[in-house]
Swiss-Prot record:
Domain of life: Eukaryota
Residue span of region Disordered: 1-33
InterPro entries: NRAMP_fam (IPR001046)
Name listed for the protein in its UniProt record: Metal transporter nramp1 homolog
Species the sequence originates in: Dictyostelium discoideum (Social amoeba)
Protein family membership: Belongs to the NRAMP family.
TM segment ranges: 69-89, 102-122, 159-179, 183-203, 213-233, 257-277, 303-323, 349-368, 388-408, 416-436, 458-478, 482-502
Residues exposed to the Cytoplasmic side: 1-68, 123-158, 204-212, 278-302, 369-387, 437-457, 503-533
Subcellular location: Membrane
Start-end of Low complexity biased regions: 14-29
NCBIfam families: nramp, Nramp_1
Function as written in the Swiss-Prot or TrEMBL entry: Depletes iron from the phagolysosome in an ATP-dependent process. May rather act as a symporter of protons and metal cations in an ATP-dependent process. Nramp1 overexpression protected cells from L.pneumophila infection.
GO BP term (any one): defense response to bacterium
Parts of the chain on the Extracellular side: 90-101, 180-182, 234-256, 324-348, 409-415, 479-481
Length: 533
C-alpha cells in the first residue's frame, strides 16, 4: 500500500512544472517554516543579506559535474557528514564497544560493520530529504502529521536525545575523574559538563567551518588515542578480519549485538543530518545542483563513517584481545583500571583522553539535534544556549543521582540507554522513509527507488522484531509476575500501533481501522443471526 501524504506544501523546488508556485511558496514560508538555518541561532529573516553569511558557497556548483570527484567541490561539502558521524563515536558507542569486545571477543565485529552500513543508508535518506526540499525531517513531521501524533513523536525524539545526553555527561565525568587521578569526583565531573558545553556556542560566532574543523580535530584525537591502544594491545589480525566478515552470535551475546545497533544508529542523528546539509548554498530549482549536492554529501558521509567504523573496530579489538574470557564486569568507569593493569599507566590516560574527546564531540551535536527537533516540531524559536540549558539540566538529574548513590550502576545505565536508542529508532526511520518515498515531497526524480523502499522496510521490520525480543527479555528480567508481563504487553501494543500509524499516514490508517471495524461488525452480526436461526 502506498502511503498517502496529507500536505503538498513540501513539494521540491526541482519540480519543473511548479517552479513559479514553489518560488512563491518558498518566499511566503521563509519566516514560518525555516526559523533557523545554522549559525549563531539567529532567525533566518534577520540573516537575509546579499552575501548570506549563514550559508557556505560551493565552487562550480552551477556547472555539470564532469569529473567523478572534484576535490574543491568535495572540500566545500566536507563538514556535515563528520558532524553527523560524531554520534557513531559518542560514549554510548564506546560503552557498547567495550561490552562487545570483553563479552564476545571479535565475534560481533560484523554487527558493528553492518550497523554502520545501515546507518549510512538511513543517513543518506535524511540527507537527500534536506537537500531536495530545503526542510529538515522535523519540519516535515510537523507538516504531515496531525497535532496529537506529532507531539507524541516529538516526545519520543526528545527522549532519545536526553538519553544520549545522559551518556555524554557520564562519559565526560568519568574521563575527568581518570585524568585527575580521582581528585575530581563523578558528581563534580557531571556538574562540569553542565558548564563546559556553553563554551562551544561561542565557536559559532567564528563561522560554521571553524566549528566543523574543531570537531574534526576531536575525532582525530580519538583516532590517535584508540589507534595507540590498538598498537599497544596487538590484537590478532586474522581474528579481526574473521570477526568482520563471518557472522557469529551466541544467545548470550544478543543483548550486546542489539546494544551495538542502538549505539551506532541513533534516531536523533537522522533528524540532525537532514538539517546540517542545508548549510551549503545551492539552487534547489536546478536539478543539476541538487544532484551534485546529493553526490558529494554521499561521498563525504561515506568517508566520515568509514573513519568512525575503524575507530570503533580498534576499540572492540583492544578489549577483545585483553579481556575476552577474563572478566564479566567492565565498562566506561572500570576500563581505565583494566587497561592500566594489562598495558601500563600510559594506556589508562590515553583511554581517558579519547573518552573525553568523545564526550565533548557528542555534546554539541546533541545540542544541535535538540534545537532542530524542537524548532521543527513545535515551530518554536529558542536561543541555542536556552535549549542547551534545558537538555543538559534534564540529563544531569539522573546522571547525578547515579553518580552520588551508586557509581557501580553507571555502566548498566549506559547499556540500557543504548537499548533505549534502538527502541526509539523506528520513530525516525519510518517518517524519513515515508517522506523520501513521496513524489509530492521529493519529486519524481528524487523520490526513493522501489528497491530502496523495500530494503528500508525490511530494516524497519528487523528493528521492530529486535525490539520485541528486548521488551520480552527486559520484562522477564524485572519480574515474571503476570501484572508486569501485562504492562509490558500493553505498552508494546501501543508502541506497535503508533509505528503502523506513522508508516501509513492518518487517512490510510483511518481507512484501515474502519475496514477492520466493519469486518468485525459483519462477523458479529452473522454470528448473532446464526444463533437466532
Amino acid at each position: 500500500m502506498t502511503p498517502r501524504i496529507e500536505s503538498e506544501e513540501s513539494a521540491p523546488l526541482v519540480n519543473k512544472n511548479n517552479n513559479n508556485n514553489n518560488d512563491n511558496n518558498n518566499n511566503n514560508n521563509v519566516d514560518e517554516e525555516n526559523p533557523l538555518i545554522i549559525e549563531s541561532g539567529i532567525p533566518i529573516e534577520d540573516l537575509e543579506q546579499k552575501n548570506k553569511p549563514y550559508l557556505i558557497k560551493v565552487p562550480n556548483i552551477d556547472k555539470p559535474d564532469s569529473k567523478w570527484i572534484n576535490f574543491k567541490t568535495l572540500w566545500a561539502f566536507t563538514g556535515p557528514g563528520f558532524l553527523m558521524s560524531i554520534a557513531y563515536l559518542d560514549p554510548g558507542n564506546l560503552e557498547s564497544d567495550i561490552q562487545a569486545g570483553a563479552m564476545a571477543g571479535y565475534q560481533l565485529l560484523w554487527v558493528l560493520f553492518w550497523s554502520t552500513v545501515i546507518g549510512f543508508w538511513l543517513q543518506m535518506l535524511a540527507s537527500r530529504l534536506g537537500v531536495v526540499t530545503g526542510k529538515h525531517l522535523a519540519e516535515h513531521c510537523r507538516e504531515q502529521y496531525p497535532k496529537t501524533p506529532r507531539l507524541l513523536l516529538w516526545l519520543m525524539t526528545e527522549l532519545a536525545i536526553i538519553g544520549s545526553d545522559i551518556q555524554e555527561v557520564i562519559g565526560t565525568a568519568i574521563a575527568l575523574q581518570i585524568l585527575s587521578n580521582g581528585h575530581i569526583p563523578l558528581w563534580a565531573g557531571v556538574l562540569f559538563t553542565a558548564a563546559d558545553t556553553f563554551t562551544f556556542l561561542f565557536l559559532e560566532k567564528y563561522g560554521i567551518r571553524k566549528l566543523e574543523a574543531f570537531f574534526c580535530s576531536l575525532i582525530a584525537i580519538m583516532a590517535i588515542s584508540f589507534g595507540v591502544e590498538y598498537i599497544i594491545s596487538k590484537p590478532d589480525q586474522i581474528e579481526v578480519v574473521k570477526g568482520v566478515f563471518i557472522p557469529l552470535c551466541s544467545q548470550n551475546n544478543i543483548s550486546q549485538a542489539v546494544g551495538i545497533l542502538g549505539a551506532v544508529v541513533m534516531p536523533h542523528n537522522i533528524y540532525l543530518h537532514s538539517a546540517l546539509v542545508q548549510s551549503r548554498e545551492i539552487d534547489r530549482k536546478s536539478e543539476t545542483q541538487v544532484k551534485i549536492a546529493n553526490k558529494y554529501n554521499r561521498l563525504e558521509s561515506a568517508f566520515a563513517l568509514i573513519i568512525s567504523f575503524i575507530i570503533n573496530l580498534l576499540l572492540v579489538s583492544v578489549f577483545a584481545k585483553g579481556f575476552y574470557g577474563e572478566t564479566t564486569e567492565i565498562g566506561l568507569s572500570s576500563a581505565a583500571d583494566f587497561l592500566m593493569d594489562k598495558y601500563g599507566k600510559v594506556a589508562k590516560y590515553i583511554w581517558a583522553i579519547g573518552l573525553f574527546s568523545a564526550g565533548q564531540c557528542s555534546t554539541m551535536t546533541g545540542t544541535y539535534s535538540g534545537q532542530f527537533v524542537m524548532e521543527g516540531f513545535l515551530k518554536l524559536k529558542i536561543a541555542p544556549w536556552k535549549r542547551l540549558l534545558i537538555t543538559r539540566c534534564t540529563a544531569i538529574v539522573p546522571a547525578m543521582v547515579v553518580a552520588i548513590l551508586s557509581t557501580s550502576h553507571l555502566d548498566s545505565l549506559d547499556q540500557w540507554l543504548n537499548i533505549l536508542q534502538s527502541i526509539q529508532l523506528p520513530f525516525a526511520v519510518v517518517p524519513v522513509l515515508l517522506f523520501t518515498s513521496s513524489e509530492k515531497i521529493m519529486g519524481s526524480k528524487f523520490k526513493n527507488h522501489w528497491l530502496n523502499n523495500q530494503f528500508v522496510r525490511f530494516l524497519s521490520l528487523l528493528i521492530i522484531a529486535i525490539n520485541i525480543y528486548l521488551i520480552i527479555t527486559f520484562s522477564m528480567q524485572i519480574s515474571e509476575s503476570a501484572w508486569m508481563i501485562s504492562i509490558v504487553s500493553i505498552s508494546f501494543f501501543f508502541y506497535f500501533i503508533f509505528i503502523v500509524y506513522l508508516s501509513m499516514g492518518q487517512e490510510n490508517f483511518n481507512s484501515m481501522t474502519k475496514k477492520i471495524k466493519n469486518l468485525f461488525n459483519n462477523n458479529s452480526n452473522q454470528t448473532y443471526n446464526n444463533i437466532n436461526y
